[in-house]
Amino acid sequence: AYGGGNIMDWIGHHNDIAHWGAGMDASGPEEVEAIGWTQSSTDVYDTPVDYEIRCVYPGGVDWVIASHLPMGTRWIGEEGWVAVDRGKLTASDERWTRLDYDPGPVVIPASTDHIDNFIQGIKSRRTCVASAETAHRSITPGHLGFASHALGRRLRFDARTERVLNDSQAHALLDKTYRKPWKR
């Protein structure tokens, strides 16, 4: 889905945080379905202006990526919710947003400068906060959403093998033949 419009632009900025917060950086959805997509009323764009991608992740975790929802990431649990959006933190329980709140043993790496973090990663050979693998896994639901929309059906996906299951037509949309001399 080259040039995938707002979906493919913003999914990398928010879904990476969603994966990170849910402990699913190296994972992906098991099911994806595109719902209610509408195209631009002009011929300037060929990507949807309104969209919803519903995903099911391992453990039955429901995941919604949609243009009608506020920007950012929200985790909803049995005791309430926590949301982040490009530096802003809100929660159903205000105590969870206080700086003196003890989150437990979780250590979150900080990066206020992705460019410097990337350069330092090259120099040190350490994984960057926003690694290529994280970016790839974060935008995968968007690519699958485009395939689901194009075919008008829900897709089942194996994140380990990165294959659409039992749907060669859908998989073909996502797995293009490489030009020579490039190989897999």
Residue ranges and their predicted role:
Residues 43, 55-112:
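NAD(P)-dinucleotide binding in Rossmann-like oxidoreductases
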Residues 5-8, 12-19, 112-116, 133-143:
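A structural signal for well-ordered alpha-helical segments within the folded catalytic domains
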Residues 46, 120-184:
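C-terminal helix-rich "cap/oligomerization" subdomain common to oxidoreductases
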Residues 1-58:
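Rossmann-like dinucleotide-binding domain that binds NAD(P)(H)
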Residues 28, 49-51, 69-71, 78, ...:
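Residues that flank catalytic or metal-binding motifs in active/ligand-binding sites
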Residues 1-8, 37-42, 101-108, 122-134:
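Active-site rim elements
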Residues 10, 14, 20, 46, ...:
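Tryptophan-centric aromatic hotspots in well-structured domains and transmembrane helices
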Residues 24-34, 62-65, 82-85, 127-131, ...:
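Acidic/polar loop patches that form or flank catalytic/metal-binding clefts of enzymes
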